[in-house]
Amino acid sequence: FHYSVDYRIGTRYMGEYIADNFKREAMRVPLLRELLMTDSVYIASNITFDNLAPLSTYLGRPGDPAKGGLPFGEYMKRQDQHRQAEIAAMLDAKRFIDRASDLYGYANFVCDTSGSICEVVDPDNPDDPVLTCLAEQLLMVWIKGSDAHTAELVRRFDRAPKPMYYQPDFLHAMWQDYRSTHSVTDETCDPDHFVRWTYARALAHRQPRYGAMARWGVTVTAEEVARVTSPAVFDDLMVQAIDRKAATD
């Protein structure tokens, strides 16, 4: 059973926010406004495991409204909505483990977390509610990338920047630094350039947090995962990771 935390966020917890944002835009068009007001059309998100664009679009980017930017206050409000949704979605994992077993008879379960999980937990707190819940039900696995993988992620993001969730303190610092170093205001900031500029710094910010989270589980490398060709090979890799962890504890 594949439990996608991002999909759960975009459907169960932020689905109404996303749909309302679509409707807000549609209400600016006279024809669509009339149809909406008479319940003649239905507007909804078609988010899927493979297409999370409705969620990313709703999160948005701060900056110049003429370039699709949001006021920084509205941007931070949506960031906080995502934070609460992400925590709730991860705490739902236990219920979906039971559901997968009871409904479908699945003995195996994969919890596909969001990359921003490190932004909403405190790995140095032994009582962190989210990590405690996950550790009791799942084997947490960190797929550790190399510098080359990081560089490739940055290149991909530069080609197609997308909104993401970050810690409030980090975002405030980036927003202040960007405006001062680029001599722009909240209203003149280029939204895409800001998120591109922030992304590489965000990856560096996240690495030590992922490393600290790894103490709650095991670590495998991206190269090891790339060599997985079957369930049996995957199982063997997990055994190796557990053995490595036991040898260093």
Residue ranges: model-predicted function:
Residues Y13-P123:
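ATP-dependent small-molecule kinase phosphotransfer cores
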Residues T11-R12, C118-V120, A148-V154:
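Switch/connector loops and helix/strand junctions flanking conserved nucleotide-binding motifs
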Residues P123-P129:
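Charged helix-capping and loop-helix junction motifs
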Residues F1-Y13:
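Short beta-strand-centered segment that lines the nucleotide-binding/catalytic pocket of NTP-utilizing
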Residues F1-Y3, L139-I143, T221-E223:
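Hydrophobic/aromatic beta-strand patches that form the interior of the parallel beta-sheet core
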Residues S183-D249:
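NTP-dependent small-molecule kinase module
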Residues D112-T113, V130-S180:
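Conserved phosphate-donor/acceptor-positioning beta-strand/loop module used by diverse small-molecule
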Residues G63-M76, A160-F194:
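A solvent-exposed, charged loop/short amphipathic helix patch at secondary-structure junctions
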